[in-house]
């Protein structure tokens, strides 16, 4: 029983195999294996026809050979030894490996058009988002109309109108309810009213209020005086004198 070595072929073994094939011819592989300890006849034959045979065509496959290879595979399937006979100088492994190369190439070619639409759509989506963000029209949850209803222009620009005053004082009055803000959506178009906490023209307002109060007091005094001048008739005294 011949023990077979499962390792790679060494250069010294390749040279000895070439000498034996030249001596015995590429036929009697069992006799050749006896001269190579650890190698079987099948191993010697495969090593010769796949690697060492000088008739092996090591040039790249041509387009004509590729078409013939695909046609032969449609007929014979994965019978690579039969297919290799149709290609002089090509080994079983050569035709098998190149068929897989052709299939991988076709897979890449067919998959490229499928990736283009998604890439284009993603790039166009990113471009549109950048345009919307640059123009100020981009929002996550609200449309432009809803944003106007919820945040009127006066409310958004409100802090900037009074940026020269004490912000702490402003916030205190804002949260204590001294500043009235209208958040109703149906009244968003109406102008918002604020108390004039800057104390502008407060004296004139006070004077108007005092004048109004004084006018009312004068009218009440005149009414009381008018009532005091009404003549009083003593009907009881008239009755007593008649009796």
From Swiss-Prot:
**Where, subcellularly, is it found?**
Nucleus
This one is known as: Transcription factor MYB54
InterPro entries (alphabetical): Homeodomain-like_sf, Myb_dom, MYB_TF, SANT/Myb
List the lineage, top down: Eukaryota, Viridiplantae, Streptophyta, Embryophyta, Tracheophyta
Query: Which Pfam families does the record associate with it?
Result: Myb_DNA-bind_6
- The answer to whether keyword Signal applies is no
Offer a single GO CC term for the protein.
Answer: nucleus
User: Mind telling me which SUPFAM superfamilies this protein's record contains?
Assistant: Homeodomain-like (SSF46689)
Q: Where is this region: Disordered?
A: 206-227
Q: Where is the composition biased (Basic and acidic residues)?
A: 216-227
């Amino acid at each position: 029983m011949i023990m077979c070595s499962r390792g790679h072929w060494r250069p010294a073994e390749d040279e000895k195999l070439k000498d034996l094939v030249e001596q015995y011819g590429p036929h009697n592989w069992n006799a050749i294996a006896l001269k190579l300890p650890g190698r079987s006849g099948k191993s010697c034959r495969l090593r010769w026809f796949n690697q060492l045979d000088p008739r092996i065509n090591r040039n790249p496959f041509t387009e004509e050979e590729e078409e013939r290879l695909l046609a032969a595979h449609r007929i014979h399937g994965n019978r690579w030894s039969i297919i290799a006979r149709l290609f002089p100088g090509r080994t079983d492994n050569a035709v098998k490996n190149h068929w897989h190369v052709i299939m991988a190439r076709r897979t890449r070619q067919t998959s490229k058009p499928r990736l283009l639409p998604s890439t284009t759509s993603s790039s166009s989506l990113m471009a549109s988002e950048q345009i919307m963000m640059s123009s100020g029209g981009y929002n996550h949850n609200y449309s432009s109309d809803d944003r106007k209803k919820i945040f009127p222009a006066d409310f958004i620009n409100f802090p900037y109108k009074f940026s020269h005053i004490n912000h702490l004082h402003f916030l205190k009055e804002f949260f204590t309810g001294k500043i009235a803000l209208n958040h109703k959506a149906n009244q968003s178009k109406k102008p918002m009213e604020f108390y004039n906490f800057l104390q502008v023209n407060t004296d004139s307002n006070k004077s108007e209020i005092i004048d109004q109060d004084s006018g009312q007091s004068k009218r009440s005094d005149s009414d009381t005086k008018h009532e005091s001048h009404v003549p009083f008739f003593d009907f009881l005294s008239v009755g007593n004198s008649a009796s």
